C-alpha cells in the first residue's frame, strides 16, 4: 500500500480531523484542519473518495513570495481534495490556478492516487517542479522545509532531512516500511544525524529544541495516509492514521472516509479535538525555558514512559482500524 506521511510543525497547534461530504460537483474527503476552522476551508493533509491523497511541507528556499496573495497552501489542498481523482489532475489544477495569477504558496506538495501514481510537487507562486515517485530511488521521496529545485541557500530543515533519511534507510532497504514506521518511529525519535545518536534512547535527561530533530515543541500531528491495494474501493479501505497534539507522547487513532475516531473529531468548544487538547497539555508539562531568549528544553526523563504508553495505545488504534478495513474487504469479496 502507498503511504503518505506528514509530521506537522505549525503555529496552529490544535488540530482536528473531519469528513466533508460530497456535493453535485465535488468529492467527499477526510482531512486534518486547524482548530477553529469551522468552515473546513484549509485542509493540511487528507484523502478523498477517489483515492487521491495530498499533504504539504512549507518550503523556505523557493522564489520569494512578494505577492499580496500568500499562505494559501491549505486552500489549494482543499480544492485538490474536492476535485482531483488522479495525480495528473493535481498538476492540472495548479496550471489553471497559476494562469489566473499568483498561486500564493511556497510548498512541497506530496500526493498520490489510487492507481499508484504520485510524487512531490515543489511549487511557488508562478511555477512548479514535479519529482515523480516512479523515478525515486527505493520508491520513496523525503522532503523537509526546503525544495531540491530551490538551490543551496536557505535549506531550512536540512538536518531533519538527514535524520529522516538515516532512520528510514534500513526499513526502505528491507522493504518493511509501515505506517508505524513513521508514527511510532520517526515521530517519536530524537535522533540527530550530526551526532549519530538518538538522545531519547541513550540516557540523556534533557534536550534543547533547536529544530534539528524531527519532533519539536511546535509539532502538532503525525499523520500517515495508507492507500488502497489494486482492486479495492478507496472510499471503503483507505485509512488516515492520526496522532494529534504532541506526537512523541500521543497515540494513533484511525480515520476513514465515513468513520473518524471520536478523539479526533471537533467535539470540544472552538472546534477542538479531545486528543489534541489533552496532548498539548501534556506537552506543556514537558517543556521549560529560563527566559524568552533561551531555547525550550524537553524533559526526556518524564517523556520516556509516555512514549511507551503512547505506543501501546497506538497498537490498539491500529488494531481497531485494520479490523474495520479487513471486515469491509471481506464483505466486498463475498458480495
Cite the ranges covered by each PLM segment.
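C-terminal, well-structured catalytic/ligand-binding subdomain of enzymes
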Residues: 1-41, 46-52, 56-82, 113-335
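Intrinsically disordered, low-complexity linker/loop segments enriched in Gly/Pro
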Residues: 74-107, 112
Amino acid at each position: 500500500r502507498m503511504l503518505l506521511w506528514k509530521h506537522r510543525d505549525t503555529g496552529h497547534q490544535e488540530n482536528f480531523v473531519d469528513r466533508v461530504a460530497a456535493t453535485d460537483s465535488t468529492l467527499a474527503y477526510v482531512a486534518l484542519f486547524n482548530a477553529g476552522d469551522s468552515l473546513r476551508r484549509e485542509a493540511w493533509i487528507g484523502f478523498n473518495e477517489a483515492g487521491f491523497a495530498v499533504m504539504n511541507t512549507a518550503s523556505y528556499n523557493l522564489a520569494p513570495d512578494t505577492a499580496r496573495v500568500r499562505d494559501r497552501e491549505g486552500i489549494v489542498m482543499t480544492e485538490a481534495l474536492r476535485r482531483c481523482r488522479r495525480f495528473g489532475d493535481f498538476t492540472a489544477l495548479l496550471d489553471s490556478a497559476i494562469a489566473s495569477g499568483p498561486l500564493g504558496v511556497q510548498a512541497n506538495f506530496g500526493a498520490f492516487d489510487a492507481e499508484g501514481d504520485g510524487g512531490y510537487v515543489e511549487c511557488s507562486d508562478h511555477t512548479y517542479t514535479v519529482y515523480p515517485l516512479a523515478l525515486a530511488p527505493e520508491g520513496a521521496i523525503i522532503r523537509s522545509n526546503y525544495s531540491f529545485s530551490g538551490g543551496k541557500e536557505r535549506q531550512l530543515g536540512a538536518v531533519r532531512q538527514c535524520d529522516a533519511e538515516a532512520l528510514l534507510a534500513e526499513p526502505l532497504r528491507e522493504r518493511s516500511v509501515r505506517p508505524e514506521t513513521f508514527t511510532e518511529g520517526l515521530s517519536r525519535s530524537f535522533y540527530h544525524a550530526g551526532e549519530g545518536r538518538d538522545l531519547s534512547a541513550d540516557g540523556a535527561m534533557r534536550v534543547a529544541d533547536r529544530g534539528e530533530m524531527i519532533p519539536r515543541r511546535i509539532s502538532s500531528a503525525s499523520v500517515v495516509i495508507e492507500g488502497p491495494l489494486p482492486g479495492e474501493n478507496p472510499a471503503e479501505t483507505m485509512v488516515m492514521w492520526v496522532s494529534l497534539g504532541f506526537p512523541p507522547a500521543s497515540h494513533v487513532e484511525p480515520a476513514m472516509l465515513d468513520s473518524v475516531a471520536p478523539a479526533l473529531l471537533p467535539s470540544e468548544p472552538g472546534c477542538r479535538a479531545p486528543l489534541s487538547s489533552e496532548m498539548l497539555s501534556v506537552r506543556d508539562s514537558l517543556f521549560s525555558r529560563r527566559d524568552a531568549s533561551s531555547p525550550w528544553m524537553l524533559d526526556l526523563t518524564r517523556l520516556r514512559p509516555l512514549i511507551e504508553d503512547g505506543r501501546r495505545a497506538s497498537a490498539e488504534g491500529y488494531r481497531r482500524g485494520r479490523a474495520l478495513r479487513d471486515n469491509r474487504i471481506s464483505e466486498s469479496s463475498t458480495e
